[in-house]
Structures are given as C-alpha cells and as structure tokens.
Amino acid sequence: MPELATSGNAFDKRRFSRRGFLGAGIASGFALAACASKPTASGAAGMTAAIDAAEAARPHSGRTVTATLTPQPARIDLGGPIVSTLTYGNTIPGPLIRATVGDEIVVSVTNRLGDPTSVHWHGIALRNDMDGTEPATANIGPGGDFTYRFSVPDPGTYWAHPHVGLQGDHGLYLPVVVDDPTEPGHYDAEWIIILDDWTDGIGKSPQQLYGELTDPNKPTMQNTTGMPEGEGVDSNLLGGDGGDIAYPYYLINGRIPVAATSFKAKPGQRIRIRIINSAADTAFRIALAGHSMTVTHTDGYPVIPTEVDALLIGMAERYDVMVTAAGGVFPLVALAEGKNALARALLSTGAGSPPDPQFRPDELNWRVGTVEMFTAATTANLGRPEPTHDLPVTLGGTMAKYDWTINGEPYSTTNPLHVRLGQRPTLMFDNTTMMYHPIHLHGHTFQMIKADGSPGARKDTVIVLPKQKMRAVLVADNPGVWVMHCHNNYHQVAGMATRLDYIL
C-alpha cells in the first residue's frame, strides 16, 4: 500500500476471485425521464448550447487523465470478514483518480452488474450531461459501456459513486482529487481517509433493510429509534437520532477496526488528511489521538484555517485538515455518531503499540468542528444573494411512514426549482422533521449564510439538523437539469429529492 498518496491509488489492492453475486435490485429513484417535462426541440438545442458554452468557459490545461472502471460483483476481505459485494475492479475503496485544475478526465466504464448503474462525480462542477445522474445522464445498462468526459474547473477533495437505487450502500465508491497548481499550503505527506458503514455480505442486505424501514407494520419502537437492528443512542451533535440502521461494521479505507490500515510518516511532518464520508446512513465524529487538527477546506473549498480536536462529518461531506505528526502510534478514530460504534486507522511515526481497537481518544469530546464554525477564505466567497429571490428547500417526512419529501413531494412527483443563468438566489433550507438530513446539490457549491448574516463555508453537502432552518447563497453558473437530495441513501430512495432546472 503506497503510504504517500501523491499519485496513483492510495489504498490497499486486495484482490479476490469473482463470484456471481447480485442482491435484489431496487429501481432507481432517479429515472425521471417519464415524469419530467420534455423540452421542445429548440429548447433542448438551446440547453445543449448553454452547456457547451459553460464547458468552453472552464479552464483547459490541454492534459487528459484517463481511467477505466468496471463495476462488478467481487469477494473482498475487510480485514477478517470476507464478503460478497459490488466494487469498482475488486477493491474497496476503488482506485484514486487524480487530476489538476483544467485537466480533462476521461473514464471508460463497463457495467458487469446485473442492473443498470452510473458514476456520479460528487462535488465537481462539471458539465451537466456527464453528471452521472438521470435525467441528465442515462444509466449504463447491464453489460453496457459508457465514457464520461469532462474538464475539472476547481481544486479539491471529491469522490465518485453510483446514483442508482441502493448501490451506494455496497462497495462502489472511490476518491477523486483535483490538485491546485497554485496550492498555497505546504505539507510533507497526504493521507486519504474514506469512511463507510457496512452491512453487505455480513448482515442484512441494503434491500432487506429498506424493506424493513418501509414496512407499514414495523414495530413501534423502530419508529422512534430508527434502528432496525442493534441499539442506537441519541446524538447531541445531530439533534437526536443518529440514523436509521445499526451496521455490523464501520470501516476506514475498507478495513474493520481490528485490522486497521496504518499510515507511516515521520515525527514533525505536516500531513494533509483528506476525509471523505462515503457512508449511506452514518455521520461520524472523527479525531486523531494526541493531535489537534487544523481545518483548511470544506467540500474542496478553502476556509480560514480553524483548529479543532474533532470533526462532525455527514454523509458525502469532505473535510481537509492539517496535522503535525507526533512520535509514536496513534489511532485515528471515527465514532459512528449516535450508534455506539467506531471505525479506525493508525498513524505510525515511530515505535509503539496501538491501543485497544475500541479505544476512544479524549479529543472526541473536546473542540468538535461543525459547519457553522467555518468561514470561506476570501478567494472562495460567492458574495451576497439577490435580496428577493429565495428557493425553498423544505424537508419533510417521518420514520413511521418513511415518506421523505422535499417541498411536500417525493421525487417521483416533484415540482422542480427554477433558476436562470447568472441569478444569485438564496437556498432556504427548512427541516420540519425529527431527523438530520445531509442535503447535496449536484453541479454546484453554495456558501452558507451564518445566523448573524455573515458568510460561512462553501459546501455542496450540508447537514440540516431537526427543526433547523439554514440559508445559503447559490450562484447559478452551470446550466442544465440538476438533482438535489438527502444523502442518506435510504431517505433518497424513499423520495427525499427534487430538481434544480435552468430556464433559458
């Protein structure tokens, strides 16, 4: 395993023989072609021209980064348990894709699953027809091929995953890093951390869990705890319930806590840690024992450096932090928030033995970084929104009915939000439910507006707590048809999604 992930794959390449394995499929909640308003021929041509013009305006370096992905069934070793699951080329996580601002990424995908699939490039402000989500991009049928081709305009930590049904709760995910040729930070090493919650091949399948969650006859206790299996505890950071599912395992870079991966560095080195939460239903509180962390980026964009001891990271969020390595062996612990379990990896800079796999460092309970603590760097500010242009994003639903909605409708009957190119609306998040929801907008980032009206962090995914209202400014600069949804995979499939459609 390469220890310094400056290029290539930063993860173990554990390969095992294939075995035909596909669980029961759930139809994609994002196949909107049948229910979406069909544009006229002139309207479609105008949108295509607008998408092409936006692509031409992006920076272009003249370089091309190529990759090949093969989503397929595989047998994977999680560090003891060997599971049948779905992966990109027999590894969890999949291979790192790395580019520099302005590069063109060309990824050829061959679908060896028994169901349609896609690859969504999470957080990248790419051209709409390469987003990897219906209706903008058609799914790839079983046995089919597709080539994604797009330029990358912004540096940052991103990731890729499917956008079909519950495929996001298998092993189909990989990191994407876009380097900044003018990177102002100085560091000696880079450590990519991908968090995950895991049931596939060990516990009930994602499809079985979804069936339990949507069963109108499920036990009353499940309606209040949100946990079909195991015991959960309330989370103060999340405003209550920590999630819907108690998973058998929680992973860092594809490994269970007793078989944690180890990152080797030298005492005194500055390490940039890129943290990605790929989990389907779990937010994590993450800390590195014996170290403080300086948060430098949220969802790829720079913030005023802020020192914390731990971080709350919701599903699909990314944080970049800097640490100065001490001497010894230190666990990096990701507490599954509200679920009384953890994932871990090890930082090894010298002699020593790691503590017990269930060890929880004190730092988890000290200064915990949450989104409202961070402010975008001047270079990342989006400015003020238009004073009279609000876009409502009202989150609704209950655990009892599992009827998650945005603006009162499930995705199948959604009324899309509308913007015109160049507008600067305010996203008005309003969570009327008793659960937290990490809300993600495709193809864009937005800038949070703090409670006092001051500018906050740039985000493409933000946790909206129960009964919380939040605001963010959006710059409409990427024409197309874009999905906005809860990044709890189960809420998303149940209907908590809408669209942001550009009007020409």
UniProtKB/Swiss-Prot annotation:
Superkingdom in the source lineage: Bacteria
Any GO CC annotation of this UniProt entry: plasma membrane
EC number(s) given by UniProt: 1.16.3.1
Processing and modification events after translation: Predicted to be exported by the Tat system. The position of the signal peptide cleavage has not been experimentally proven.
Positions with a binding annotation for Cu cation 1: 120, 440
Subcellular location: Cell inner membrane; Periplasm
Cofactor binding remark: Binds 4 Cu cations per monomer.
Record's keyword terms, sorted: Cell inner membrane, Cell membrane, Copper, Membrane, Metal-binding, Oxidoreductase, Periplasm, Signal
Pfam families linked to this entry: Cu-oxidase, Cu-oxidase_2, Cu-oxidase_3
Binding site residues for Cu cation 2: 122, 161, 487
Residue ranges occupied by any Plastocyanin-like domain in the UniProt entry: 190-349
MF annotations from Gene Ontology: copper ion binding; ferroxidase activity
UniProt note: phenotype after gene disruption: Mutant is more sensitive to copper. Deletion does not affect virulence in mice.
Cofactor(s) the record lists: Cu cation
Reactions catalysed, as given in the entry: 4 Fe(2+) + O2 + 4 H(+) = 4 Fe(3+) + 2 H2O
Other known facts: Overexpression results in copper hyperresistance but not hypervirulence.
Chain's role: Required for copper resistance. In vitro, oxidizes organic substrates and Fe(2+). May act in vivo by oxidation of toxic periplasmic Cu(+).
Name listed for the protein in its UniProt record: Multicopper oxidase MmcO
Organism of derivation: Mycobacterium tuberculosis (strain ATCC 25618 / H37Rv)
Lineage: Bacteria, Bacillati, Actinomycetota, Actinomycetes, Mycobacteriales
